[in-house]
Amino acid sequence: MSDLAKLKNVGKAALADFAVLGVTSTAQLAACEADDLYVKLCALTGQRHDPCVYDVFAATIHQARTGEVLDWWVFTPSRKERMKAGNFCRI
């Protein structure tokens, strides 16, 4: 089992997304930025993904970096504020 699968917000869909992105470990994930992963996933798959995918990326990166376990929806309000301000990932 990948150590990514041990992170709180990682299920089958997130594991599949990480595979598409080439992210194979928690250590590698810790060096990533959620914005970059989201934009890259959309580009590689040729489709815009639900913004909640970004929230999952943010939560898992946070856990990988700090060890603090937070639900993915904790990151939703800040993402929505960025979207409202026009500062969310440009695809």
Question: Which ranges hold each PLM region?
Answer:
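C-terminal extensions
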Residues: 1-8, 12-91
